[in-house]
C-alpha cells in the first residue's frame, strides 16, 4: 500500500506578504522568475496588487484582490506587484521542488550561463543578519528586473531564457524526481489504490484515517516575492 501523509495532492503551502520595495520602474513588488516543473496558485487574502506574467503567448497583467484565485503553469515568468498590503496564500504543485531549486530568476544572460555567478547573485545566507538578508533580496530583485525588462522589450529572447534556465537546473533533476515520487506521485498512487479497493468493495483503508496539523516552521523568511511563513517540506 502506498503511504502518503502530506497535504492533499502533494502541494506545498505558504503565506506571503509581498515586498513593498519600490523598483526603478516605480512599481513595488517582488522578483520575476519562473518554475520549470511546478504550477503555482495564489489565493489572495488581503490588500491589493497584480501579477505580471510573460509567456510565449505574450504579456498579461492579472489584478489581485481579496478572494481572487489566480494560477499559472510551468514556464510562466511572473512578477508580483504590491499596491497596498498584498497578502497571499500560495499553493505550489509538487511540494518541495521549489525549495530544491525549481525557480530561476530572470537575471541577465551572463549570470544564467555561469552557475557559480548565478548562485552568488541569488543566494541569501540563512545565518546573515536580517538587514543583510534584506539587502541581498532587494539587490537580486533589481538584477532580475534588468533581465525581465529585456524580455519584455524583446520577447523573442524568451526561448533562449527557457533553454538557459533548463540547463541551469539540469543537475538537480534526479533529486527533484525523488521528491516528486515521495510527494505528488505517492499521493496520486495512494488514490489509485484506494479506488481499486473501493471497486472491490474493500473499505479497509478507511480504518487507517489520521488527522494532522502543523504550524509554520519559519516566519518572515525572505523569498523571491516577499516575506514568507513556510511549513516543513518533504
What are these regions, as identified by a protein language model?
Residues 207-234:
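Charge-dense, extended regions
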Residues 15-35:
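Conserved short histidine dyad/triad with adjacent acidic residue
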Residues 32-34, 39-44, 61-62, 70, ...:
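His/acidic/aromatic-lined binding-pocket segments of jelly-roll/cupin-type domains
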Residues 85-158:
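Double-stranded beta-helix
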Residues 125-203:
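An accessory alpha-helical subdomain
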Residues 64-66, 77, 81-89, 94-104, ...:
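Acidic/histidine-enriched, beta-strand-rich ligand/metal-binding domains
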Residues 36-51, 91-93:
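Short, conserved beta-strand element in jelly-roll/cupin
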